[in-house]
């Protein structure tokens, strides 16, 4: 299996006097060594100030904008971009090819539940291997962050969610399905390990709906037992966000699912349009939780990603960078807009904007505070 010394889902820091992305090895858990050499994407180049006009032109080209790989805040950190194609058995490879053509550095969220939907029984290991290989093949030598089955709630499965739940959003969903049907997770992890062995993509695997350190530890042990070496968890609940430092003691990276994080933090069903103003990643409580996770990642020098809709917001992306986020996952069409937004600001502005929003009392205040700091000078 191809193994990576520098783990998943993240951009790599390039200081202002570096012309290429830093390639320092990161420590492995449990004494695991790196194995094969990491195959990086194109190195990020430092851009002069006159590059702003080019960034705007690139952004207008839509999905082709992603061809300019190393978008970065000026005199600051290199950012790598990940796309988020759905992992449908039939459409997965085609969507992955679209993302690759759009210039994505990899896949920041490979949704595997689409292999399981519209079925009366679980897919076999062989069926899953074929589906996963179709996506991995589109990103040779690049990172693909795979989320294990996230069914339940709005995506119930007849062979996993046996009982109707009065409140499925708080019920048996995500990793919790493994309690009821452990064979589902075991088979999926085996299939991912086989697919990763057969392809050259750098595979990272993460579990959704993790709330406790025990859950993170158990998942990491299961994934590593089949040979998957880069293991993470989703941060979608306030519990996981508050325990981010402890989570990062047992996993290699974390990825913030801002859609669910907002829903659970504000106690507002994200399916209800009338509560839309509460399900807003600009809500100060959500931003402070993101900041706490970013602080934990910085303290341990481990990757922190965002794969919710917040990552595709050009106004919010610099704030997320300032809060400590190291990778952003978005649809291919959003790549250019977000890249252009980051190219227009400095790392210092990102950090200042993050500090400003942490002091905000309302979502409107947070937007205004960030805009004031990030306004063109």
Positions of predicted regions on the chain:
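Acidic, glycine-rich flexible loop/linker segments
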Residues: 1-104
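Conserved alpha/beta-domain cores
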Residues: 69-377
């Amino acid at each position: 299996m191809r193994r990576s010394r520098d783990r998943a889902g993240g951009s790599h820091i390039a200081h202002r006097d570096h012309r290429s992305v830093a390639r320092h090895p990161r420590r492995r858990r449990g004494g695991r060594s790196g194995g094969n050499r990491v195959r990086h994407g194109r190195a990020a180049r430092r851009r002069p100030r006159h590059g702003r006009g080019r960034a705007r032109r690139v952004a207008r080209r839509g999905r082709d904008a992603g061809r300019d790989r190393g978008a970065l805040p000026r005199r600051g950190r290199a950012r790598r971009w990940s796309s988020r194609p759905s992992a449908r058995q039939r459409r997965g490879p085609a969507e992955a090819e679209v993302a690759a053509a759009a210039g994505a550095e990899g896949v920041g969220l490979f949704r595997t539940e689409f292999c399981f939907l519209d079925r009366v029984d679980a897919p076999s290991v062989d069926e899953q291997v074929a589906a996963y290989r179709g996506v991995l093949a589109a990103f040779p030598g690049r990172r693909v962050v795979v989320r294990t089955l996230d069914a339940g709630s709005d995506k119930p499965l007849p062979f996993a969610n046996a009982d109707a739940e009065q409140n499925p959003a708080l019920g048996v969903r995500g990793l919790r399905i493994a309690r009821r049907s452990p064979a589902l997770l075991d088979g999926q992890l085996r299939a991912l390990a086989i697919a990763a062995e057969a392809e050259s993509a750098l595979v990272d695997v993460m579990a959704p709906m993790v709330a406790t350190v025990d859950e993170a530890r158990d998942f990491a042990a299961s994934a590593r037992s089949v040979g998957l070496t880069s293991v993470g968890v989703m941060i979608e609940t306030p519990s996981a966000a508050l325990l981010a430092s402890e989570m990062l003691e047992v996993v290699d990276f974390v990825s913030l699912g801002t859609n669910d994080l907002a829903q659970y933090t504000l106690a507002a069903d994200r399916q209800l349009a009338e509560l839309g103003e509460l399900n807003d990643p600009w809500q100060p409580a959500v931003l402070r939780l993101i900041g706490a996770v970013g602080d934990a990642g910085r303290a341990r020098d481990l990757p922190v990603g965002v794969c919710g809709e917040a990552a595709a917001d050009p106004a919010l992306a610099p704030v997320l960078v300032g809060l400590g986020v190291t990778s952003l996952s978005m649809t291919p069409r959003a790549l250019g807009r977000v890249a252009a937004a980051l190219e227009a600001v400095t790392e210092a502005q990102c950090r200042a904007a993050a500090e400003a929003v942490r002091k905000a009392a309302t979502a409107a205040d947070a937007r205004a505070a960030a805009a004031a700091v990030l306004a063109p000078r």
